[in-house]
């Protein structure tokens, strides 16, 4: 059985896209299992940058099967725009398969997302306003519309009519917002359904079949561990489960099929939006990290909050997803620092913290326990062998592995595919 998986260990933006692309080159099948178009990642191929939001990273290769699984929520308009944009850049989406069980983002989901966020004022959680949360809420409430419903007109009209009536009451009565139009939505989604029809299939069966045939299957995670609905810094989280268990349910295969689980660790820490961030640096260090790392959101363009690497977070992620290996990214961004700090523990009210706090008040009150390591103060972006890395760079990543208890698997020293150092077989 040849499977591999990529998980973000922090708050997202760890460089998962680059690691996924690196592994995808050797895969036969690439599977997206959760999330929606709220998370973007950039993949650089032949010095050309591709910004992907819904499409699996394997779409950039002609010989890969690409699957958008059951756990993904799909905005058909956005997906079709992404396919069109890809084709304009000389790539084809003919290898794409979309789960007939996946839930569909509707215009009223986006309207509700925007209205709800606006109503919160200073208490907003930083949603991307793409309708992801309201779509997942409908899924849980068992009133959602699935891809398969788009091809059963009677069912689709019935579900759409119910939802439009209910959602318009919420929009107009609760939020004093504009209602959505049933006829316009129906007409648009009939067109979307026809355009996507050739891609729709039973992806659960497709993934299982590929595994049984011993094909190399890569499970591609979106968002990251600290945004997990159950285990992240709730309520500043996403609406799905971007951990290994979420990939199992989202792709429709049992957990024993998930092997070679890589946890992607950015060599420093970033976060977009509100929520606790124990190692955040609201100073020159933070500004330098943001400038050197070009830390702005792929989808939103928002400046990311920056700070020192927090190994309490990474260690927590390692346990939640039973990580097999670490993939350290953006190590080159730290090239100019004379010294570096990593958080190896928290203190709360003067006492060492065991595990990871559930209470946001406790987490915000935690004081990071830092270790200081010497920097390497040299350009490592051209290095292609682990042994050629400066001694202090090796000590930095090896300390990460030591504290988290997870061995190193990949070290990235730049955005391009060839700026990657493999330490293990990825399948």
Task: Give residue spans per PLM region.
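Non-transmembrane, aqueous-exposed alpha-helical and coiled segments at domain scale
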Residues: 1-427
């Amino acid at each position: 059985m040849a499977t591999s998986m990529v998980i973000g260990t922090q708050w997202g933006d760890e460089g998962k896209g680059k690691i996924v692309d690196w592994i995808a080159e050797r895969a036969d099948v690439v599977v997206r299992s959760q999330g929606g178009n709220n998370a973007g990642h950039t993949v650089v191929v032949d010095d050309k940058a591709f910004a992907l939001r819904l499409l699996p990273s394997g779409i950039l290769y002609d010989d890969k099967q690409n699957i958008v699984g059951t756990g993904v929520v799909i905005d058909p308009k956005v997906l079709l725009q992404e396919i069109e944009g890809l084709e304009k850049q000389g790539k084809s989406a003919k290898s794409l398969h979309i789960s007939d069980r996946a839930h569909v983002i509707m215009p009223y989901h986006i309207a509700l997302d925007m209205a709800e966020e606006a109503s919160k004022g200073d208490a907003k959680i930083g949603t991307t306003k793409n309708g992801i949360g309201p779509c997942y809420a409908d899924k849980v409430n068992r009133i959602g519309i699935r891809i398969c419903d788009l091809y059963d007109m009677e069912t689709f009209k019935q579900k759409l009519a119910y939802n439009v009536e209910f959602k318009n009451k919420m929009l107009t009565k609760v939020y004093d917002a504009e209602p959505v139009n049933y006829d316009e939505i129906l007409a648009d989604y009939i067109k979307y359904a026809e355009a996507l029809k050739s891609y729709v299939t039973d992806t659960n069966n497709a993934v299982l079949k590929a595994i049984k045939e011993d094909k190399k299957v890569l499970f591609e995670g979106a968002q990251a561990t600290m945004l997990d609905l159950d285990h992240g810094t709730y309520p500043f989280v996403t609406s799905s489960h971007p951990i290994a268990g979420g990939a199992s349910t989202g792709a429709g295969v049992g957990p024993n099929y998930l092997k070679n689980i890589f946890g992607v660790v950015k060599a420093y820490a970033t976060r977009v939006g509100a929520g606790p961030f124990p190692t955040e640096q609201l100073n020159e260090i933070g500004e330098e990290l943001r400038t050197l790392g070009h830390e702005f959101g792929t989808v939103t363009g928002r400046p990311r909050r920056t700070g020192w690497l927090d190994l309490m977070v990474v260690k927590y992620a390692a346990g939640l997803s039973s990580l097999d290996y670490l993939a350290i990214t953006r190590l080159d961004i730290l090239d100019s620092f004379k010294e570096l700090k990593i958080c190896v523990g928290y203190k709360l009210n003067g006492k060492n913290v065991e595990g990871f706090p559930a209470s946001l008040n406790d987490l915000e009150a935690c004081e990071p326990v830092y270790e200081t390591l010497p920097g390497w103060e040299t350009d490592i972006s051209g290095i292609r062998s682990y042994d050629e890395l400066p001694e202090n760079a090796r000590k930095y990543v090896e300390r990460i592995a030591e504290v988290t208890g997870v061995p190193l698997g990949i070290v990235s020293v730049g955005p391009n595919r060839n700026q990657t150092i493999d330490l293990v077989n990825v399948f």
